[in-house]
């Protein structure tokens, strides 16, 4: 598997993967990604800012994660408390190809993205997910993330 920055050539595949995820959420009555985002324009902008990263297996993109430097307005106030107020990166739009789920790819994405962040000298990561997205909550806990509260 290869971890790399996404390119414009990946865009159709990334849109297809996010559309699959939207349908999966909808089928499970999870109101995540049901209001239009992520969409092609959001992903294209993330590619142009070198924030969208992918995991590739035998030439096929099978996972994606967006890495954004903080601060972010949505993280300014939470019902709970962050571990600290030091600089951080935020992970967004984590997605794994539906047919590849259950193979540890989310953990691999987190691990690779964490290494990317550490190379910048930043030691904090923030991430949020929908309260009904139990699969992502389990993946985050399994990867050592600590729930600090709700947005």
Region roles according to the model:
Residues 2-16:
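A short beta-loop-alpha structural element at the N-terminal edge
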Residues 51-67:
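Conserved beta-hairpin
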Residues 66-95, 101:
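Conserved acyl-donor/pantetheine-binding loop and adjacent beta-alpha core of acyl/acetyltransferases
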Residues 96, 102-115, 138-142:
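Conserved acetyl-CoA-binding loop-helix of GNAT-fold acetyltransferases
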Residues 107, 119, 131-149:
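Conserved active-site alpha-helix within GNAT-family acetyltransferase domains
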Residues 110, 117-129:
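Conserved GNAT acetyl-CoA-binding A-motif
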């Amino acid at each position: 598997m290869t971890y790399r920055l996404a390119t414009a050539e990946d865009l159709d595949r990334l849109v297809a993967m996010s559309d699959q995820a939207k349908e999966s959420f909808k089928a499970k009555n999870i109101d995540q990604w049901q209001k239009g985002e992520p969409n092609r324009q959001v992903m294209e902008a993330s590619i142009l800012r070198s924030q969208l990263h992918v995991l590739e297996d035998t030439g096929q993109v099978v996972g994606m994660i967006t890495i954004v430097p903080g601060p972010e307005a949505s993280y300014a106030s939470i019902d709970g408390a962050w571990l600290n107020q030091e600089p951080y990166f935020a992970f967004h739009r984590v997605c794994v190809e539906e047919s590849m789920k259950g193979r540890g790819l989310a953990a691999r994405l987190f691990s690779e993205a964490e290494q990317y962040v550490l190379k910048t000298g930043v030691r904090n990561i923030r991430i949020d997910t929908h309260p009904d997205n139990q699969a992502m909550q389990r993946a985050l806990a399994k990867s050592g993330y600590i729930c600090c509260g709700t947005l």
